[in-house]
Amino acid sequence: MSHLVLKPGTLTLSQIRDISRNKLTLELADEAIADINISSGIVQKIIDEGRTVYGINTGFGLLANTKIEDKDLQLLQRSIVLSHAAGTGQYMQDATVRLMMVLKINSLSRGFSGIRLEVINFLIQLVNAEVYPCVPEKGSVGASGDLAPLSHMSLTLLGEGEVSYKGQIMSAKEGLEIAGLEPIELAAKEGLALLNGTQASTALALEGLFNAEDLFAASSVIGAMSVEAAMGSRSPFDPRIHAARGQKGQMDAAGLFRHLLGDESEISLSHVDCEKVQDPYSLRCQPQVLGACLTQIRQAAEVLGTEANGVTDNPLVFQDTGDIISGGNFHAEPVAMAADNLAIALAELGAIAERRIALLIDPNLSKLPPFLVENGGVNSGFMIAQVTAAALASENKTYAHPASVDSLPTSANQEDHVSMATFAARRLRDMSENTRGVLAIELLAAAQGLDFRAPLQPSAAVAKAKAELREVVTYYDKDRFFGPDIEASTDLLLTSSFNSYLPAGILASF
C-alpha cells in the first residue's frame, strides 16, 4: 500500500492512476494547513461581522436570497447534505469512491473553500481506514456540481447513510467506529463546499481515461499482431507518409507500429514480392485511426488532469482580499466533453478491431483457413466469436452519442443549463468493457493466425505478445467451449501488461 503526502493542486496523472487502482494512506503536506486555516477564518469573520454572503448564511439555488439566522447555520449545512442525498441506482465501486474522496480532499485543501481542517482530516481518516461511503451511481446532471453523489459521500461525516468496508455494507455509524471517528457538526459553508464540485464525474472520467489508455496500448500491440497474421505490408507505417500530413497523434501511432513490427520479420520477408497491392483499411489505416484516438485521449488527459487539481465548489474564498465570490466552476462541461471524446475513441478502437477480426476469419482476405480452424465445416472456429465482437462494437456506437449536448433545466430554472457529465463519464466503464471484449477476441484470432504462419516468425514484440497469450490460452485445434478462452484473454488485457510494449511518452499516465 502506497503512502501519499498530498500537496494540494499537484496530483499527477500517474499518481491518480495509482489512487484509482490501489489502496493508499494519505496525509496533508504541512504547507497546506495555513491556507486551510486562513480560508475558514475568513468565513468565520463574515459571520462575526453579521454580513450576508451567499453560501454562508443564505439559502441555495432559487432560495439564494433567503437570509439564514446565525442560530440555524449548522442546521442549514446538515439539511443541505440530507436533502441533496437523493441519488439512485447501484453503488459506485469502492475504488471510484476512494478516488472521488481524494479529489475532494485535494480541492478543499487548496484554501479556496472556507472549510475547517477538522473536516478535511475526517475525510483523510476515512480513506486511510478504507471506510468508503456508499454512493449511488445515478442522480447527477453535472451542475451545480455532482450534488447527489457528493451529498451521499458527505452523509458519512454526519453518521448517516451506509458505508463499505472491505466489501461489507454497514451503517455509517458502524463504519465510523471502525475508523475511530465520531460524527461531526458542519459549520457555515462546509456542507455546501463538500457537495458542490465535479469530483464524482471527474473520478469516473479519469477511470475511463486510464481504461482508454490501456486499451489504446492493447489495440496497438494486437493490431500489429494482426498485420503479421494477415501478412500485411509495413509500408503504410513509413514515417514520410505521416510527416506529410503532420498530425502528431498519427505520426506517433505510426512510430509505435514501426516500434512493434520492426523493419522486417520472417513473415514479412516471405511475402515481399506477393501480388497484393494494398491492404484493407483496417490494417493500412491503423495510424490514421489510432492516431486520431490517441489525440482525443491525450486531450482528455490534459483536461481531466487539470480538473483533478482544480477548485470547483462555489462560492470561492480569496485569501489576499478576503473576498467571497460566486461563480460557476461547478459546471462540469469540460469533464463532459472530455468524456464524450473518450467515448468516441473507445468506440473507434473497438470498431476497427472488429473489422480486423472479420478480415482474419475471411480466407479471401487473409489467406488463412476459414474461421481460423482446421477441418472447417465440422469445426466452426471463430465464426461466432466474430459475431460477439460485432455485437460489442455495435453497442458502443450507441453509447458514443455525446452526452454533453443534452441539458434539462433544474432547480426551478435557476440551474437552466447542465452538463450531464456524470453519465458521460459513467458510461465509459461499459464502453471499456465492450472494447476490451473485442480486443480480447482479436488477440485470440491474431495469435491463431500467427500459429498458422509457423514456422515463419513475426517480429520480436509480436512474438512476445503471442507467447503471453499462449501461457493462458492454447492453440485452437478443434471446436471447444469458447467462452473460457475469451475470458482468459480478457483477464490478460486487464493486467495492462501490454502497456510495457509502448515507448515512454506516448500516453500521459504511464
Curated annotation (Swiss-Prot):
One of its GO terms (biological process) is L-histidine catabolic process to glutamate and formamide. Pathway: Amino-acid degradation; L-histidine degradation into L-glutamate; N-formimidoyl-L-glutamate from L-histidine: step 1/3. It comes from the Bacteria. It catalyses: L-histidine = trans-urocanate + NH4(+). It is an enzyme of class 4 (lyase). GO terms for molecular function: histidine ammonia-lyase activity. Its EC number is 4.3.1.3. The modification 2,3-didehydroalanine (Ser) is found at S144. Pfam families: Lyase_aromatic. Contains an active site 4-methylidene-imidazol-5-one (MIO), which is formed autocatalytically by cyclization and dehydration of residues Ala-Ser-Gly. Coiled coil: none annotated. Keywords: Cytoplasm, Histidine metabolism, Lyase. Signal peptide: none annotated. GO terms for cellular component: cytoplasm. It is found in: Cytoplasm. There is a cross-link at A143-G145 (5-imidazolinone (Ala-Gly)). HAMAP family: His_ammonia_lyase. Belongs to the PAL/histidase family. This is Histidine ammonia-lyase. The gene is hutH.
